[in-house]
Amino acid sequence: DERDYDLEKLGNFIEENVDLDTVLSLAKEPLPAAPEECIPDKEADVTIGVAMDSAFCFYYQDMLDSFRRAGAEIKFFSPLEGDIPDVDGMYFGGGYPELHIAELEKSRTTHKLKDLSADGMPIYGECGGLQYLCTSYEIEERVYKLADLFPAETVMTKKLQALGYTKGQADSPIFRGEVRGHEFHYSVTDCASDSRLAYTMERGKGIVDGMDGIYEHNSVASYMHAHPGSFPVDDFVNSCRKYKQR
């Protein structure tokens, strides 16, 4: 068989040109150990609830690790299936709320968020989180009532509205400073004329007129997905700490 002949030639070539004993000895050596994560042994004194289910599932692990390094315990919960746990702040990441919009409209979590926001709990949302925290979300000409933290209405579009890297200066009640990240969405958000926007964008589209990060009380939400290396984690965790210690 021609294939057997080719394999025999290959075997002879390797035997003549490769130090097989050395290769085999190296194969027995253990691989270098993975570096240990440099999270200091710091006891958590504040708890942040992170929405995690099929509606909210886009998170950077580094962001969650940064919260822990800043002294926060992470408690996951599902706006689709459960209630809000006992927490000092909340984080709603990106995902696909439009695929679960009817369930979210009826969710216990949705109906409780406005009161928690008015009470001063720090609540942060990104993209899908922004859409969820607005007054309503229009999809295929049907309007769904949502959390109503912000005087803004979101409309799903068939056309891509934004895709690319972002950079902005944030001046919000719960964090300040430069924030970098990216945006990717098929929706537009129409804000009321008296809406307050915290991010002045140097790069990226944002919500409207070069601004992103709508805020009300201690709640902030943006189209930007913040990069963990630039997000003011300590500010946000300290805001949760102040809320807990009132």
Mark where each language-model region is.
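Internal gly/pro-rich beta-alpha loop/helix module
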Residues: 1-40
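Phosphate-binding active sites in nucleotide-utilizing proteins
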Residues: 46-118
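Short acidic (Asp/Glu) and glycine-rich catalytic loops that position anionic groups and cofactors
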Residues: 92-96, 129, 217
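Short, glycine-/Ser/Thr-/acidic-enriched flexible segments
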Residues: 54-56, 81, 96-98, 131, ...
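Cysteine-nucleophile active-site neighborhood
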Residues: 97-172
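Short, surface-exposed amphipathic charged segments that create phosphate/polyanion-binding patches used
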Residues: 1-12, 88-93, 164-166
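C-terminal and late-domain segments of enzyme folds
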Residues: 17, 42-44, 56-74, 79, ...
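Hydrophobic, well-ordered secondary-structure elements that form the walls
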Residues: 90, 126, 147, 184, ...
